[in-house]
């Protein structure tokens, strides 16, 4: 326990917050190249095949990034834009790939929350796009 005089001289040391996306180096997004595109299974109560890519960023760090939305066109050597944001049920996945930029296509047939998935606005009067696999 410090004395009042010690606190006057030195003060309390405040801890700096730890970054939740350290590989981005305080940038909002980073460009990278897909090293491996694969599927993985989520943690315990959930069950699915989640699409994930191992990405080498321009600062030469490698991260696991989640590919959001239904269906994607990514493969090895695709250039992608990576943003922060973890996936709660995938351990070690702390980043998201931005859809609709660089080599990543937007989600086809998406009508709601389109900006999050890089989907263009459908033409007025046009029938909704057919669903993919059932």
Curated annotation (Swiss-Prot):
It comes from Porphyromonas gingivalis (strain ATCC 33277 / DSM 20709 / CIP 103683 / JCM 12257 / NCTC 11834 / 2561). One of its GO terms (cellular component) is small ribosomal subunit. SUPFAM superfamilies: Nucleic acid-binding proteins (SSF50249). The modification 3-methylthioaspartic acid is found at residue 89. Residues 124-134 have a biased composition (Low complexity). Residues 10-20 have a biased composition (Basic and acidic residues). Belongs to the universal ribosomal protein uS12 family. This is Small ribosomal subunit protein uS12. With S4 and S5 plays an important role in translational accuracy. Residues 1-27, 103-134 are annotated as: Disordered. The keyword Ribosomal protein applies. GO terms for biological process: translation. CDD domains: Ribosomal_S12. Keywords: Methylation, Ribonucleoprotein, Ribosomal protein, RNA-binding, rRNA-binding, tRNA-binding. Part of the 30S ribosomal subunit. Contacts proteins S8 and S17. May interact with IF1 in the 30S initiation complex. InterPro entries: NA-bd_OB-fold (IPR012340), Ribosomal_uS12 (IPR006032), Ribosomal_uS12_bac (IPR005679).
């Amino acid at each position: 326990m410090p004395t009042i005089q010690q606190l006057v001289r030195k003060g309390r040391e405040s801890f700096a917050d730890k970054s939740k996306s350290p590989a981005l180096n305080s940038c909002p997004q980073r460009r990278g190249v897909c090293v491996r595109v694969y599927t993985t299974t989520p943690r315990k109560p959930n069950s699915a095949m989640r699409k994930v890519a191992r990405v080498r960023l321009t600062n030469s760090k490698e991260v696991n990034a989640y590919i959001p939305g239904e269906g994607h066109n990514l493969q090895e050597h695709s250039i992608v834009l990576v943003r922060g944001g973890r996936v709660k049920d995938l351990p070690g996945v702390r980043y998201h790939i931005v859809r609709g930029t660089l080599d990543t296509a937007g989600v086809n047939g998406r009508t709601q929350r389109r900006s999050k998935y890089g989907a263009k606005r459908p033409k007025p009067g046009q029938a909704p796009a057919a669903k993919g696999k059932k």
